[in-house]
A protein has these predicted regions:
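Domain-core detector
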Residues: 1-199, 205-263
Length: 263
């Protein structure tokens, strides 16, 4: 069974000098989901080391402090000197804020994918929905209730509770909409699972069948939540590349080696 560490190690390295906004605009979600990258980080060897360190952190073998130490050491070996931002800022690859962002985002994404991969039919029957809730305190928390309502409206409230709680069936399209950033949110990651946006502090917990029925989400067996199709598989990447055409594939090959299993 996949683990958070194995989910991270399975990702392809994607060196790029692009900013976060440019990555979001240029690289399809199917490819981002299958790749290990960081904005304005074109050094493949550093990314390989970061992937390994993040996998160690996701497995619990090392803590965040040790992970930051190892990544900072790798940056020094590479010769990094605050190339893209003031020291200590998020654009500074060696800042504590930036290193925490990389470690936490990779760990949280991997845990979500491993959790979904572990879902069985029996589990989905007993716990058909997720509840989105705050798990981490933030100095300036974003308005997730507003985002939820906008995403729910975008999918016509399909499989979504209508009582104001952020609860939806595990197979509801709202999770895809949240990750895609409906209403043009620019901080989202393009994934149908937490963390839906960078440094959001939001996560989900399972909701049992009795509560779902009380919310009107499971009136019959036909509306039981289905297992989401997360990918990311070579076939997903192949479809994305075919959709974008040969020019994009050549550009992608300049950024990273994505050839395995994709022709």
């Amino acid at each position: 069974m996949p683990t958070p560490a194995s989910e991270i190690l399975a990702k392809a390295i994607l060196p790029t000098g692009l900013s976060s906004a440019d990555i979001r605009e240029t690289v399809p979600a199917e490819i981002r989901r299958r790749s290990f990258f960081s904005a304005r980080t074109a050094e493949a060897e550093y990314l390989e080391e970061a992937r390994r360190v993040c996998a160690e952190a996701a497995s619990g073998r090392i803590g965040s402090s040790k992970a930051r130490e190892l990544l900072a050491r790798s940056l020094r070996r590479w010769g990094y000197k605050d190339a893209y931002g003031a020291p200590g800022a998020i654009d500074d690859l060696g800042s504590e804020e930036r290193l925490n962002l990389i470690i936490d985002t990779q760990r949280d994404m991997a845990h979500s994918v491993a959790l979904i991969d572990s879902q069985t039919d029996a589990n989905l029957d007993a716990f058909p929905a997720w509840r989105l809730e705050r798990m981490g305190r933030r100095r300036d928390p974003r308005n997730w209730a507003e985002r939820w309502a906008q995403a729910a409206a975008a999918v016509n409230w399909e499989g979504v509770a209508r009582n104001g709680e952020m609860v939806a069936l595990k197979g509801s399209p709202i999770w895809e909409a949240l990750g895609a950033g409906v209403q043009d949110y620019r901080d989202t990651l393009g994934n149908p699972y937490p963390p839906f946006a960078f440094n959001s502090g939001m996560d989900w917990t399972s909701v049992d069948r009795d509560e779902c029925e009380a919310l009107g989400l499971v009136p019959g067996e036909a509306k039981r939540g289905k297992r989401p199709d997360l990918g990311p598989l070579p076939a997903d990447v192949k479809r994305a590349l075919e959709r974008l055409g040969p020019d994009y594939k050549r550009k992608l090959e300049e950024w990273a080696h994505f050839g395995e299993g994709v022709e």
